[in-house]
UniProtKB/Swiss-Prot annotation:
Record-given protein name: S-adenosylmethionine uptake transporter
PANTHER family recorded: ACYL-MALONYL CONDENSING ENZYME-RELATED, SOLUTE CARRIER FAMILY 35 MEMBER G1
GO CC aspect terms: plasma membrane
Domain EamA: 22-141, 160-280
Membrane disposition: Multi-pass membrane protein
Presence of keyword NAD: no
Residues that span the membrane, as ranges: 4-24, 41-61, 74-91, 98-118, 121-141, 148-168, 178-198, 207-227, 237-257, 260-280
Length: 294
């Protein structure tokens, strides 16, 4: 095995770790959300996340928390609150695999939001692919059938929130430290969640508290795994492997919740995955062209 292949496989392994952790997070969120309110799950998730980050704050010192855009951190925290509470609630309504496929559509929402917020010019091919991707969402969610549950749209609202976060990250927080982004967002989200969570409070069991701690910790681990992967291989090299999360989620959901993806989820995934792959590679090509022209 040559060095280039070893490096590539090393990067992919780190990326796969992020997928496994993300799938486990969804399974834990669904399990916790069946008894605890999504507001309470969000509070504990980000409360424990901020606690886990404290040793890093102490180690790197107050300079790591310096920020020139406090308002942006507040906005990110509000979007995280809205996104994670909607996502957790949606997971209690829909199968884990359905939620996973919805997450694949986030680049579609990001593309549309980028037009209005960043004033980006989008080539017509991307618009066509975006429409195709949304057709895939319709195929999966089946809004035209009697089996449609409107509450599943909470997953769509969450996806839009996460797309907004991507836009904010792209526009505002380039010069912010990763630690400040994580820590301030966790603090804001926990503070916003607590008053609402108190209205629906159910004291967690010891086991639930342990899961909530793991949930709060693993969010930072996902980011670490992703950054590690992207430091070794190009982000577009990992794109095809992103969709292995559907397989991982399906296996976990089957053994824990006895869920199995229905035909509409599979059909929707078959449409959405190629659409988002095209957008990812198109974005990469566009960025490369801009870089070469500078």
């Amino acid at each position: 095995m040559n060095d280039a292949l070893k490096t590539y496989l090393n990067g992919i392994c780190w990326f796969l770790l992020s997928l496994v952790t993300s799938s486990i997070n969804d399974v834990m969120s669904k399990y916790l959300g069946t008894r605890l309110h999504s507001f309470e799950v969000a509070f504990f998730r980000f409360f424990f996340s901020s606690i886990v980050l404290l040793p890093f704050v102490v180690y790197y010192g107050k300079n790591a928390l310096k920020t020139s855009r406090p308002f942006v951190h507040v906005l990110r925290g509000l979007l995280l609150f809205f996104g994670m509470t909607s996502w957790t609630y949606g997971l209690t309504i829909a199968p884990v695999t359905t939620a996973t496929v919805v997450s694949f559509a986030i680049p579609l929402f990001t593309l549309i939001l980028a037009v209005f917020i960043l004033n980006e010019n989008i080539i017509w091919q991307r618009w066509v692919v975006t429409v195709v991707g949304f057709i895939g969402l319709v195929v999966m969610l089946k809004p035209h059938t009697k089996d449609f549950n409107p509450e599943i749209l909470y997953l769509i609202l969450a996806a839009i929130s996460f797309a907004m976060l991507d836009i904010i990250n792209k526009k505002f927080v380039v010069k912010e430290s990763m630690l400040s982004m994580l820590f301030y967002s966790a603090i804001v989200t926990a503070m916003v969640s607590l008053p609402v969570a108190m209205q629906y409070w159910i004291t967690p069991s010891s086991f639930e508290l342990a899961l909530l701690f793991v949930l709060g910790s693993s969010g930072s681990f996902i980011l670490f795994f992703l950054l590690k992967a992207f430091s070794i291989v190009d982000a577009t090299a990992t794109a095809p492997y992103r969709y292995l999360e559907l397989v991982i989620s399906a296996i976990a959901a089957y053994f824990i919740f006895n869920e199995f993806p229905d035909k509409s989820t599979v059909h929707g995934a078959v449409i959405i995955i190629p659409a988002t792959l095209f957008i990812i590679y198109s974005e990469k090509k566009s960025m490369s062209s801009k870089h070469e022209s500078q």
